[in-house]
């Protein structure tokens, strides 16, 4: 199954801006890989909460649409809230 996530490039980075994003219902994320510059992105929490429950989400290549440009990525790490059903941050790698 293929998954597509619509994202926007983040201009502010850091702990404070990430907290503001989470309070607004968004998830901060980063895409990195060898030979490429890291890209900080954000997307809606509702876009990720249901698809991350599927097992193949972690093993298949995903498509992230960053302001109209599609990028193939793979999930590297997910940080979740300690007791709430919330995703706090995701690390993607370029596929």
Curated annotation (Swiss-Prot):
One of its GO terms (cellular component) is cytosolic large ribosomal subunit. CDD domains: Ribosomal_L25_TL5_CTC (cd00495). GO terms for molecular function: 5S rRNA binding; structural constituent of ribosome. One of its GO terms (biological process) is translation. PANTHER family: RIBOSOMAL PROTEIN L25/GLN-TRNA SYNTHETASE, ANTI-CODON-BINDING DOMAIN-CONTAINING PROTEIN, RIBOSOMAL PROTEIN L25_GLN-TRNA SYNTHETASE, ANTI-CODON-BINDING DOMAIN-CONTAINING PROTEIN. The gene is rplY. This is Large ribosomal subunit protein bL25. Belongs to the bacterial ribosomal protein bL25 family. InterPro entries: Rbsml_bL25/Gln-tRNA_synth_N, Ribosomal_bL25/Gln-tRNA_synth, Ribosomal_bL25_long, Ribosomal_bL25_short, Ribosomal_L25_dom, Ribosomal_uL5_bac-type. This is one of the proteins that binds to the 5S RNA in the ribosome where it forms part of the central protuberance. Keywords: Ribonucleoprotein, Ribosomal protein, RNA-binding, rRNA-binding. Part of the 50S ribosomal subunit; part of the 5S rRNA/L5/L18/L25 subcomplex. Contacts the 5S rRNA. Binds to the 5S rRNA independently of L5 and L18.
